[in-house]
């Protein structure tokens, strides 16, 4: 079960990084009162937790179900395929962190744009595509996949909620660091699968 927790934390890092960026963007927005600013920050944190948590919980479930269908055909190669998927996802996260590649910028979110449900949904899907690929590897871990997806969703929701507040206080300097941690953890889990 510790592998699931590490996987959940690693998969949450993309959403965490975007949430930090959203919180930092919120810090640059002028409000008519401190109460209005607090209210809008709470709304943004709750939206991030809900959207990112649900997307990160559903996508690995889809990957798990697709992987279950293919596992019979690929049984002998499955650990290596899972290893390659996780190492590839980890390397992608490391590359994006080094390049300073931020999803909210790719989606065209600027300081003057408000975050609505459509934009939040788009960001949630964009940050959870990797989780679908990682869901394939749940077939290779001795865990209940449904429980694992619930844990992934809850961990992502918590990281996203607090990421908004952390971003409000710290700005964007933590975004890349979160992605580095996630990338390293995914690579480590991938290597562990074949050892």
UniProtKB/Swiss-Prot annotation:
Among InterPro entries, the record links this protein to: Mntp/YtaF (IPR003810), Put_MntP (IPR022929)
MF GO annotations: manganese ion transmembrane transporter activity
> Where does this chain mainly localize?
membrane
> Can you say where in the cell this protein is located?
Cell inner membrane
Transmembrane region(s): 4-24, 46-66, 69-89, 123-143, 146-166, 171-191
- Give a Pfam family name: Mntp
Keywords linked to the UniProt accession: Cell inner membrane, Cell membrane, Ion transport, Manganese, Membrane, Transmembrane, Transmembrane helix, Transport
What membrane topology is annotated for this entry?
Multi-pass membrane protein
User: Which GO cellular component terms, listed alphabetically, does the Swiss-Prot or TrEMBL entry include?
Assistant: plasma membrane
Stretches assigned to coiled coil: none
Reported function: Probably functions as a manganese efflux pump.
> Which family would the database say this protein is a member of?
Belongs to the MntP (TC 9.B.29) family.
**What name appears for this protein in its UniProt entry?**
Putative manganese efflux pump MntP
Native species = Psychrobacter sp. (strain PRwf-1)
């Amino acid at each position: 079960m510790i592998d699931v927790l590490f996987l959940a934390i690693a998969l949450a890092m993309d959403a965490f990084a975007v949430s930090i960026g959203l919180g930092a963007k919120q810090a640059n927005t002028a409000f008519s009162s401190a109460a209005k600013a607090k209210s809008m920050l709470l709304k943004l944190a709750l939206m991030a937790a809900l959207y990112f948590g649900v997307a990160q919980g559903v996508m690995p479930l889809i990957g798990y179900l697709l992987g279950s269908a293919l596992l019979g055909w690929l049984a002998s190669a499955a650990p290596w395929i899972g290893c390659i998927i996780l190492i590839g996802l980890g390397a992608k996260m490391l590359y994006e962190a080094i390049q300073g590649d931020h999803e909210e910028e790719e989606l065209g979110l600027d300081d003057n744009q408000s975050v609505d449900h459509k934009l939040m949904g788009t960001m949630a899907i964009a940050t959870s595509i990797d989780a679908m690929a990682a869901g394939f590897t749940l077939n290779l871990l001795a865990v209940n996949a449904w429980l694992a997806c619930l844990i992934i969703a809850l961990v992502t929701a918590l990281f996203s909620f607090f990421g908004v507040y952390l971003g409000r206080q710290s700005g964007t300097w933590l975004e890349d660091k979160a992605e580095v941690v996630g990338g390293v953890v995914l690579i480590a889990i991938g290597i562990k699968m074949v050892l």
